Amino acid sequence: MASKMKTRKSAKKRYSFTVNGKVKYKKQNLRHILTKKSSKRKRNLRKSGNLSCFEVKRIKTLLPYG
């Protein structure tokens, strides 16, 4: 009986796949020390980011069942 591939739990918590196969992630720098950051910068950081196609291949190896 073949063993299953393991999912990297750290990648599972950080990335999620869309229906079209793109990878979404939450942007960094929005946890603390927010007073010196402008409202525009904080507003743009609230939006989710998309990875490029080169990085998607690497993430798919970390998340085989994603």
Curated annotation (Swiss-Prot):
Domain of life, source organism: Bacteria
Keyword vocabulary terms for this entry: Ribonucleoprotein, Ribosomal protein
Query: Mind telling me which InterPro entries this protein's record contains?
Result: Ribosomal_bL35, Ribosomal_bL35-like, Ribosomal_bL35_CS, Ribosomal_bL35_sf
**Which GO terms fall under biological process for this protein?**
translation
Record flagged with keyword Cell membrane: no
Pfam assignment, any one: Ribosomal_L35p
* Family according to the record: Belongs to the bacterial ribosomal protein bL35 family.
Q: Which HAMAP family match?
A: Ribosomal_bL35
* UniProt-recorded name of the protein: Large ribosomal subunit protein bL35
Native source organism of the sequence: Borrelia garinii subsp. bavariensis (strain ATCC BAA-2496 / DSM 23469 / PBi) (Borreliella bavariensis)
